Structure formats: structure tokens, C-alpha cells
Curated annotation (Swiss-Prot):
Its EC number is 2.4.2.17. Pfam families: HisG (PF01634), HisG_C (PF08029). GO terms for biological process: L-histidine biosynthetic process. The lineage of its organism: Bacteria, Pseudomonadati, Pseudomonadota, Gammaproteobacteria, Enterobacterales. It is an enzyme of class 2 (transferase). It comes from Shigella dysenteriae serotype 1 (strain Sd197). Feedback inhibited by histidine. Its cofactor is Mg(2+). This is ATP phosphoribosyltransferase. GO terms for molecular function: ATP binding; ATP phosphoribosyltransferase activity; magnesium ion binding. Belongs to the ATP phosphoribosyltransferase family. Long subfamily. Catalyzes the condensation of ATP and 5-phosphoribose 1-diphosphate to form N'-(5'-phosphoribosyl)-ATP (PR-ATP). Has a crucial role in the pathway because the rate of histidine biosynthesis seems to be controlled primarily by regulation of HisG enzymatic activity. Equilibrium between an active dimeric form, an inactive hexameric form and higher aggregates. Interconversion between the various forms is largely reversible and is influenced by the natural substrates and inhibitors of the enzyme. Keywords: Amino-acid biosynthesis, ATP-binding, Cytoplasm, Glycosyltransferase, Histidine biosynthesis, Magnesium, Metal-binding, Nucleotide-binding, Transferase. GO terms for cellular component: cytoplasm.
Length: 299
């Protein structure tokens, strides 16, 4: 029998989001062996079960209340949402937060040797895609009629195979499109991974665990976006040094033994510290500049 006291989280078993989802759970302190082929993996230190499934199954598992949480790409979530609404359903769920990985874009692509004069170029054309509802919504808003060719894989080969005139598919670098004689012409949807929760009443113990998990996820994301910076800075130019780090909190200032002209500065910065910024800091007289990653962070 299913233990309803344990929090059930669905994540992609393998694919684009799998490794990042696994890393996120690990950095949140959830001890779990996700390197087996088992469908359900149980955490060692928390009442959490991880269901490892296909990514396009995750929205349905959450919307149908089979699992409590799901880590899923917004593109897959939105496609399932539109699909269910088209069937007259009223799917319910909560988006708890957007995550900092899984970024991609859903784009239209056409053969390189064909002219492109905007979306109207697709009027009456046949378009291959794995996202028919997202494609339809976009082109309907443009008032463009088209024929959809549903493919669940290798969408980029459709024009060469004579199956379609254009495609609508996920793009990261564009290298796959180029290798198949295609070019990206229009972005119709931008996506990242997100954490979603089922609708309906949640047991108090589960909700407390979800709140704890959200706090840890926030800490992990903040840590990844932040750096711990240490340097020696001239006392007369402290304000200028701090101004170069607009994302920083007020720094900790420490005296340097035997040096009245400089101080040691320690700070957490939420800004990416580029080489150019470090060079500007050095030009202001800063020295011994160290930029360190942060493992965990909680405000």
C-alpha cells in the first residue's frame, strides 16, 4: 500500500532536466540514490519518495493528484495544460517557483534556402512539431492557418524527409538545425524548469516539508547566483569600490595589522563578477581580490 505520509516528487528519469534535478535535490540535503533503474527511489533522511518518469508524464501526475510535486520544463507543462483545456478539462496545480536551470526556447525553423518574411510566410504550410498546442496558440494569435504534423522525435529531419515545410522545436544552440539545413526564424515560447504542486488539501506534515524544501531551494539558487568576495581596499576609496558591486550587501570592514591606509573587505555579491569589474577594482587600488563560490546560503 502507498504511504500517504511521504512526500511524492516526480522528476525526469533521463534527459535534459534529469541531471540538474538530481543535483538540486542533493544540494537541498536530500540523501537519495538516483543512480538505479528503479521507478521509485526513497530518501534516506526525509519522508520523500522520488518518482522517475518521462517528462511529459509529470504534469498529468501532478494535475491528477498522483504525486505532490513535480520538477518539469515550462514548455511541457504549458503544452499539457493547453491539451487538457482543449478537451474541456479544468486542470489545477500551483507553480511554486521557477528554477535556475533547463532554459530553452521553442522556435520556428525553416529551410535555409527559403525566404522568410515573418510568420505570414507559414500561411497554409505544413509544420512538424512535438508541441501542437503551443504552436496553434501562437499562430492563431497571428491569424495564420497551417497544417500540423505531430512528431515525437527527430522533428528536425521532417523538411528533408518531405513530411513538412517547416518545424517548431526546442532550440538551445541551433547546431542541430544547421546540421539539417534549417535556420531558426522565430521564437514562440521561452522556458525554464519549474517546481509545481498538486491542487487540493495537503497534510500538515507534508506542507511543512514542502515549505522547508522551498526554503532550501531558495538558498541553493541564491548561493549559485552569489559570490563571496574578499579584498584589501584603500580606505579613501571605499565608496567607489562598493559602487562597483551593486548587488552586494554592505560589506564587513576589518582593519589590517600595521596598515592604516587599507582595510580588508568581505562581502556577498549577487552580481556576476566579470574580469572587467576586477580590473576596475584593481585600478581603484584594491588588491588580493578573491572571488569564491558559495556552497549554501540562507538569509
Amino acid at each position: 500500500m502507498t504511504d500517504n505520509t511521504r512526500l511524492r516528487i516526480a522528476m525526469q528519469k533521463s534527459g535534459r532536466l534529469s541531471d540538474d534535478s538530481r543535483e538540486l535535490l542533493a544540494r537541498c540535503g536530500i540523501k537519495i540514490n538516483l543512480h538505479t533503474q528503479r521507478l521509485i527511489a526513497m530518501a534516506e533522511n526525509m519522508p520523500i519518495d522520488i518518482l522517475r518518469v518521462r517528462d511529459d508524464d509529470i504534469p498529468g501526475l501532478v494535475m491528477d493528484g498522483v504525486v505532490d510535486l513535480g520538477i518539469i520544463g515550462e514548455n511541457v507543462l504549458e503544452e499539457e495544460l493547453l491539451n487538457r483545456r482543449a478537451q474541456g478539462e479544468d486542470p489545477r496545480y500551483f507553480t511554486l517557483r521557477r528554477l535556475d536551470f533547463g532554459g530553452c526556447r521553442l522556435s520556428l525553423a525553416t529551410p535555409i534556402d527559403e525566404a522568410w518574411d515573418g510568420p505570414l510566410s507559414l500561411n497554409g504550410k505544413r509544420i512538424a512539431t512535438s508541441y501542437p498546442h503551443l504552436l496553434k496558440r501562437y499562430l492563431d494569435q497571428k491569424g495564420i492557418s497551417f497544417k500540423s504534423c505531430l512528431l515525437n522525435g527527430s522533428v528536425e529531419v521532417a523538411p528533408r524527409a518531405g513530411l513538412a515545410d517547416a518545424i517548431c522545436d526546442l532550440v538551445s544552440t541551433g547546431a542541430t538545425l544547421e546540421a539539417n539545413g534549417l535556420r531558426e526564424v522565430e521564437v514562440i515560447y521561452r522556458s525554464k524548469a519549474c517546481l509545481i504542486q498538486r491542487d487540493g488539501e495537503m497534510e500538515e506534515s507534508k506542507q511543512q516539508l514542502i515549505d522547508k524544501l522551498l526554503t532550501r531551494i531558495q538558498g541553493v539558487i541564491q548561493a549559485r547566483e552569489s559570490k563571496y568576495i574578499m579584498m584589501h581596499a584603500p580606505t579613501e576609496r571605499l565608496d567607489e569600490v562598493i559602487a562597483l558591486l551593486p548587488g552586494a550587501e554592505r560589506p564587513t570592514i576589518l582593519p589590517l595589522a600595521g596598515d592604516q591606509q587599507r582595510v580588508a573587505m568581505h562581502m556577498v555579491s549577487s552580481e556576476t563578477l566579470f574580469w572587467e569589474t576586477m580590473e576596475k577594482l584593481k585600478a581603484l587600488g584594491a588588491s588580493s581580490i578573491l572571488v569564491l563560490p558559495i556552497e549554501k546560503m540562507m538569509e
